[in-house]
């Protein structure tokens, strides 16, 4: 194709555009037409419809409820910053919940010891929880903490509460985080815990948080459903001139 040639529009993209217009006139929770109905309406193969619906699912415009497809809520906006998931959800008028998967006792290998600033072989607490918003599973969070720094945490911490708030209550201030974000597909276990299709694209956020003395607080791995979450960042120039 030459630079001046018009791009080829695939049939499922035409159907997708029509379905987007249809969705604009529907309300959250409304049932969406079945594949067969859409195929008959637009006189296309059902495989074409499946491709269009797949894109709508990934973009979070529709969601599956059993065998029914319905109009989805808008994606949850998660600001990139030191705030917690709970704080972000509440700021949008949503309820944030957590389901306990497991507490685990680990020992730090060389890599984890370097990240957390502890000795090799030091005890590490691991907390794994499913994140929910208004009852919908949207993320899987795995946090590793130096056990000696948080005595009694497993016995006293309410797993449905914000871990950040609990850590702050112990006099520890979050002053810096180092985040990396990738895309990933869930493995079978992760997909089952999130109630998602194994082909659903995910955001993978790895974070190390530091306190006022620049000592590591935690190492966190968060897997977020790409069809339910989106990330936002606000950037400020250090001076008035921005050179591109």
UniProtKB/Swiss-Prot annotation:
TM ranges: none
The recorded induction information for this protein reads: By phosphate.
Question: Mind telling me which SUPFAM superfamilies this protein's record contains?
Answer: Chorismate lyase-like, Winged helix' DNA-binding domain
What role does this protein play?
A: Represses the phnDCE operon, involved in the uptake of phosphate, under conditions of phosphate availability in the cell.
This protein's record includes keyword tRNA-binding: no
Q: Where is it located?
A: Cytoplasm
Top-level taxonomic group: Bacteria
Asked whether the keyword Chaperone is assigned, the reply is: no
State the gene name recorded for this protein. Answer: phnF
The protein's matches in PROSITE patterns, at most eight in alphabetical order, are given as:
HTH_GNTR (PS50949)
Q: What is the lineage of its organism?
A: Bacteria, Bacillati, Actinomycetota, Actinomycetes, Mycobacteriales
Gene3D superfamilies per the UniProt record, alphabetical:
Chorismate lyase-like, Winged helix-like DNA-binding domain superfamily/Winged helix DNA-binding domain
GO MF annotation: an example: DNA-binding transcription factor activity
- From which organism does this entry originate? Mycolicibacterium smegmatis (strain ATCC 700084 / mc(2)155)
> Mind listing the UniProt keywords for this protein, alphabetically?
Cytoplasm, DNA-binding, Repressor, Transcription, Transcription regulation
Q: For this UniProt entry, what's an example GO CC term?
A: cytoplasm
Q: What is this protein called?
A: HTH-type transcriptional repressor PhnF
Residue ranges annotated for the HTH gntR-type domain, each copy included: 8-74
Per the database entry, where does the chain bind DNA? 35-54
């Amino acid at each position: 194709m030459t630079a001046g040639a018009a791009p080829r529009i695939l049939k499922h993209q035409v159907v997708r555009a029509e379905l987007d217009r249809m969705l604009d006139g529907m309300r959250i929770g409304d049932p969406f037409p079945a594949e067969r109905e859409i195929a008959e309406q637009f006189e296309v193969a059902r495989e074409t419809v499946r491709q269009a619906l797949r894109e709508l699912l990934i973009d979070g415009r529709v969601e599956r409820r059993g065998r029914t497809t319905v109009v989805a809520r808008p994606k949850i906006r998660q600001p990139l910053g030191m705030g917690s998931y709970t704080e972000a959800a509440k700021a949008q008028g949503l309820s944030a919940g957590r389901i306990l998967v497991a507490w685990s006792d680990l020992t730090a290998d060389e890599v984890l010891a370097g990240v957390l600033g502890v000795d090799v072989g030091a005890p590490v607490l691991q907390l794994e929880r499913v994140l929910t918003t208004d009852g919908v599973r949207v993320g899987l969070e795995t946090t590793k903490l130096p056990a000696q720094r948080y005595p009694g945490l497993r016995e006293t911490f309410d797993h449905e509460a914000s871990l950040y708030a609990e850590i702050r209550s112990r006099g520890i201030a979050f002053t810096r985080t180092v985040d990396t974000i990738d895309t990933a597909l869930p493995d079978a276990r992760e997909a089952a815990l999130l109630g998602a299709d194994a082909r659903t694209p995910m955001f993978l956020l790895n974070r190390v948080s530091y306190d006022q003395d620049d000592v590591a607080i935690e190492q966190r791995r968060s897997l977020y459903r790409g069809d339910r979450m989106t990330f936002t960042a606000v950037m400020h120039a250090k001076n008035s001139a921005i050179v591109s």
